[in-house]
Amino acid sequence: MTEPAPTRIYVDADACPVKDEIYKVAERHGLPVSVVAGAFIRVPAHPLIERIAAGSGMDAADDWIAERVQPGDIVVTADVPLASRCVKAGAEVLAPNGKPFSEASIGMTLAVRNLMTDLRSSGEVTGGPRAFSPRDRSTFLAALDTTIRRIARRRASPPAQQQN
């Protein structure tokens, strides 16, 4: 039996406000990070951090992540359609505010996102999400650490005892 690949953290980086926090947590746990953006993005020079310029096409960064993510990986994104694709692939997915996307919640989250997009385009709703706060940052850090530990426990337990 082969060992599963180590957990990798994929970051949908174009508008991610918690990249620095991800780098610190990943370094502490020794996890590789793929920082994926449509174009060049600055990342720290560190052997665990990989910068990916996926291209300028529509959803190029999303496609790059979705095509590579595996069960046991972590994806950080605010993009609900990308989150849906990654959850279906078996990855753990967190929004930058720490909110987890799961199989149980992704359908409703996607439906609400589509409804709000339609309402905004018709002019019935204006504005967007509230501003990112220090509390969001703290919640994200706790959620990322909890997710990493949960994956590590799952991988360490014998297959007959594994549970989600």
From Swiss-Prot:
Which InterPro entries does the entry mention? Answer: UPF0178
**Which CDD domains does this entry report, sorted A to Z?**
PIN_YqxD-like (cd18720)
Q: Which family does it belong to?
A: Belongs to the UPF0178 family.
Q: What is this protein called?
A: UPF0178 protein RPD_2254
User: What taxonomic lineage is listed for the species of origin?
Assistant: Bacteria, Pseudomonadati, Pseudomonadota, Alphaproteobacteria, Hyphomicrobiales
